[in-house]
């Protein structure tokens, strides 16, 4: 998350050295999601490659340089309130939480600020991106070493580090 003065101080320009730990970036400052040329949001996502990842998996920026700190802060806080307090799981619902925060803060829409700031923030990346907010656990998975032709079902056991079954585990 970056909150500062105009742009993002070029922190997304040269790439990152974060390997496969690609973050969900929010940079709600002037011009970070601008549609006139490449934006900081795009640069965060475009850096790196499939074989040499770097940068972000998705980013939210603001499409214009005419923003105001107070409104950007509310959208920003609404995004993170959605992720951590309301346990919203997707990039798009987190951004919508930011939009609802500004709407709820300024329901009378002073100077068209509510409508404007809702339309200026934008998401670069998959809106259905699942946002993970905790460190994954190590699991022990027990499964057959071979599967006979014609098999239509099998037992797969997923246990946590204490040997307890993991409820709702999905194995692919």
What are these regions (language model features)?
Residues 17-18, 122, 164:
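Generic structural signal for beta-strand residues in well-ordered domains
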């Amino acid at each position: 998350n970056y909150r500062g003065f105009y742009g993002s101080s070029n922190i997304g320009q040269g790439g990152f050295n974060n390997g496969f730990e690609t973050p969900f970036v929010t940079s709600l400052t002037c011009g970070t999601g601008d549609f006139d040329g490449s934006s900081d949001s795009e640069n965060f996502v475009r850096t790196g490659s499939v074989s040499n990842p770097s940068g972000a998996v998705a980013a939210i920026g603001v499409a214009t340089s005419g923003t105001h700190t107070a409104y950007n802060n509310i959208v920003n806080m609404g995004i993170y309130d959605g992720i951590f307090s309301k346990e919203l799981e997707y990039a798009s619902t987190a951004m919508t939480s930011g939009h609802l925060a500004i709407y709820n803060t300024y329901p009378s829409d002073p100077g068209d600020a509510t409508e404007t700031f809702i339309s200026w923030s934008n998401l670069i990346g998959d809106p259905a991106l699942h946002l993970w907010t905790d460190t994954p656990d190590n699991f022990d998975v027990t499964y057959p070493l071979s599967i006979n032709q014609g098999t239509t079902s099998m037992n797969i056991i997923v246990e946590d580090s204490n040997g307890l079954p993991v409820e709702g585990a999905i194995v692919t």
